[in-house]
Design a protein with these regions (language model features):
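Conserved active-site "lid/cap" helical segment
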Residues: 1-84, 92, 96, 155, ...
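Condensing-enzyme catalytic core mediating Claisen C-C bond formation in acyl metabolism
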Residues: 1-24, 172, 204-267, 271, ...
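Conserved catalytic cysteine-centered active-site region
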Residues: 2-4, 54-151, 190-216, 248-250, ...
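Short acidic, glycine/serine/threonine-rich loops at helix termini
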Residues: 22-23, 116-122, 182-186, 253-256, ...
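Beta-strand segments within the central parallel beta-sheet cores of soluble alpha/beta enzyme folds
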Residues: 45-54, 75-77, 105-110, 168-175, ...
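Short glycine/threonine-rich loop-to-helix capping motif typified by GTGT followed
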Residues: 58-67, 252-258, 294-317, 380-386
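Extended C-terminal subregions enriched in glycine
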Residues: 262-297, 306-309, 338-342
Length: 387
């Protein structure tokens, strides 16, 4: 183990309910999640001296501190690139703790992404902004690639052409996630599993991406408490050690996908994976369950390949016959993922990784020692190994 490995721990997790209309402000959602996480850890707001969130979060660290009764902050930070920031919020909290910059740091994300601003809509104005983002979007928007689903669809179609994958292969991810969500009382799709026939009959969003290949749009908030292993062991719950944490941006990186690369893949996730294995001293064979960012099912297959669980083009075979379901060789997204539980930019997946290691998941995998968690795909991204 090297670098950050073993020098910080997750001591608490918290969340609001997940819904399509929260009826509360985004600041209230953030405050509820933070206070819930502190209660889970057995800490009070006065113990917190650091806050981390996303650049896309509308709730400034100072506002959350005021709303929750947190006092002075020694560390505060925001990470960019949307869902790619999820694991990086925990990484930055861990770095602050390991370096002595803060003792208790809370990472949070909260939004009304369904009842207010919806990320999946066409936003043509992005391609005309007078900044580098406008230049990037101007490459893709004129060709109709103006939503996340459309961008993923182009790569999914090429992946099918290159490796013989089918829509049903993508559907296997959705079926697994919904199966897990069906037994999770906190999931939006609790009690609502689907079949592969349901997936194949769902309407097309951007060929070949179907409705049931797409994550939900959700209102809610999640928070994660990070502190030192020494302090964590004296708190309420079993400390979950951060065995590795990494960020990655590939060569010629764009948003959602980098169309001008020579090879089909997600090299930014491959870079994250290599760092995680190096820091932790582990291999894919050491992982009992994984939480893979599943905003769209095709990218779940590409992640399995980039992280070394299987070779290029082999993910369709790797996931066959229930391999990623509870009881399979690598259960993924045992909370239901963003397809089944809620889309909270990946933060709810980190919380599920903690539950698996505590032994408190509603879909508990036996004898869990190490959990891999990834953040948003197609963008500069991040990942964790928890143990």
């Amino acid at each position: 183990m090297t670098g950050l490995s073993g020098r910080s721990a997750i001591a608490g997790i918290g969340a609001t309910d997940f819904s399509k209309k929260s009826g509360r402000s985004e600041l209230r959602l953030a405050a509820e999640a933070v206070l819930d996480a502190l209660d889970d850890a057995g800490l009070s707001p006065s113990d917190v001296d650091g806050l981390v969130t996303f650049t896309m979060d509308s709730n400034l660290e100072t506002a959350v501190a005021r709303a929750t009764g947190i006092g002075e902050l020694k560390f505060f930070s925001q990470i960019g690139y949307g869902g790619g920031a999820a694991a990086a919020t925990v990484q930055q909290a861990a770095l602050a703790v390991a370096a002595g910059g803060a003792e208790v740091v809370v990472a949070y994300r909260a939004f009304n992404e369904r009842s207010e601003f919806r990320f999946g809509q066409v936003m043509t104005g992005l391609s005309s902004t007078a900044d580098s983002r406008g230049v990037e979007y101007s490459w893709s928007y004129p060709h109709g690639l103006s939503t996340p689903a459309a961008s993923v669809a182009m790569i999914a179609r090429r992946y099918m052409h290159e490796y013989g994958a089918t829509s049903a292969d993508f559907g296997a991810v959705s079926v697994a996630d919904r199966k897990h969500a069906a037994t999770n009382p906190k999931a939006f799709f609790y009690g609502k599993p689907i079949t592969i026939e349901d997936h194949q009959n769902s309407r097309m969003i951007a060929d070949p991406v179907r409705l049931l290949d797409c994550c939900q749009e959700s209102d809610g908030g999640v928070a994660i408490v990070v502190t030192t292993p020494e302090r964590a062991k004296d708190l309420k719950n079993r400390p979950v050690i951060i065995e590795a944490a990494a960020q990655g941006s590939g060569e010629d990186q764009f948003t959602m996908y980098s169309y001008y690369r020579d090879e089909l893949g997600l090299p930014e996730m491959g870079l994250v994976g290599r760092q995680l294995w190096d820091q932790s001293g582990l291999t894919p064979n050491d992982i009992q369950t994984a939480i893979l960012y599943d905003h769209f099912t095709p990218y779940t297959l590409l992640q399995l390949e980039e992280l070394g669980f299987c070779g290029k083009g082999e993910a369709k075979d790797f996931i066959a016959n229930g391999a990623i379901e509870l009881g399979g060789k690598l259960p993924i997204n045992t909370h239901g993922g963003q397809l089944g539980e809620a889309y909270i930019h990946g933060m709810n997946g980190i919380a599920e990784g903690v539950r698996q290691l505590r032994g408190t998941s509603v879909n508990q995998v036996p004898n869990v020692e190490h959990v891999l968690v990834t953040a948003g795909t197609g963008v500069p991204t991040s990942g964790l190994i928890l143990g």
